[in-house]
Curated annotation (Swiss-Prot):
<keyword id="KW-0175">Coiled coil</keyword>
<feature type="propeptide">
    <location>
        <begin position="190"/>
        <end position="225"/>
    </location>
</feature>
<feature type="coiled-coil region">
    <location>
        <begin position="56"/>
        <end position="153"/>
    </location>
</feature>
<feature type="signal peptide">
    <location>
        <begin position="1"/>
        <end position="16"/>
    </location>
</feature>
<keyword id="KW-0732">Signal</keyword>
<feature type="coiled-coil region">
    <location>
        <begin position="257"/>
        <end position="354"/>
    </location>
</feature>
<comment type="similarity">
    <text>Belongs to the TMP family.</text>
</comment>
<feature type="propeptide">
    <location>
        <begin position="17"/>
        <end position="55"/>
    </location>
</feature>
<comment type="function">
    <text>Structural protein that crystallize inside the trichocyst matrix.</text>
</comment>
<protein>
    <recommendedName>
        <fullName>Trichocyst matrix protein T1-F</fullName>
    </recommendedName>
</protein>
<dbReference type="GO" id="GO:0055039">
    <property type="term" value="C:trichocyst"/>
</dbReference>
Amino acid sequence: MFKVAVCALLVLASTAINVQSSIWTSKDQKAFAQIHQSGWGKFILNFAELHLTTGGILSELNSEIEKLIGEMEEELAGVHHEFNRRTDVHNREVARLEQEIQDKERELFNAHDFYDNVLIPQGERFAAQLEQLQENIAHNRQTLEQATVQRANDHETFESEVVEHNDAISAIDECLQLLSTIAAPSLAEVKKVQKNLAKIQNSLKKHNQFQIFVKVLLEITVDSNFADQGALRDIIVAFNNLRVELVDSLNQITADEAEQVADYNAQVIALNQEHAEFQRAVVVKNAEIEANTTKQEQTLDLIDELDEDLATLNGQLQAENDDYAFATDVYNATVAEYNKEINAANQALDLLNQPRFQDYVKSQLKGA
């Protein structure tokens, strides 16, 4: 249609209606001015003048012009239809993109929330728990070391006390043996008994509970008359009593040592079991920390990916809006141009059907 119009306009370029003719009213001249702003309107008037001046029939001209106007209206309807289709596509695309953007924003928010409020606190908690486990392990080993040192010290004390008790018992046995073989001991034998008592006293100087027995025996041996059989029996009884006390004491410290050894062994087992549990807990905690670290890295990668996806979607939405805005501008300009041409064509059609137009054509023919 437009190609034909361009060719026709070129052909009719030299043809122009004399709008200054006295035939035309001021209203006609105003209409001419509006029509000449339109290519189609100007074309119709010039074509009509040419058609009539060459003997054409007005009704045929009207039919052709109406057909031309109808074609323009059909083309305008096509423009409306295509733009409506473009609008539907635009609305669907915008709705889709906005929904995807909303979904991505929700995913991005959830990823940030998961990272900030779950993974970070969880990682800090795991690190604190691992530190506590390491402190527990250090305390466990320190306790075991202290218990081992204390056990060694206690055992050394026990062995020393056993030696002391055995030395004292041996000295008592020697005194008893000596006292049992004499009827009237000499001064040398008494001195020997007293020497053994001094030895006993020295052996048992750390054991206050025996000091009174030793002290009494020393006093007896100093003051007693060993020739007196009654006094001698009292001395022997005292020695025997001391020996019994020493044997009981030795048995007790031996039993205490056995109990302490058992307690120590049980403590060692318990501490080692606890240490093994701590070590297993450390392995588990390290695995949890590694998993948390991996999850943090994956979540940060996801956040970066979601940011990129969101930027892409926003770019697509902006591009679609820009493209639709351009299409709308083209549509509005096209519709305005079609409306201008159709209105001008209708005005031209109305004007050429005025009797004055035919009079003008006749006047032009006479003038020719």
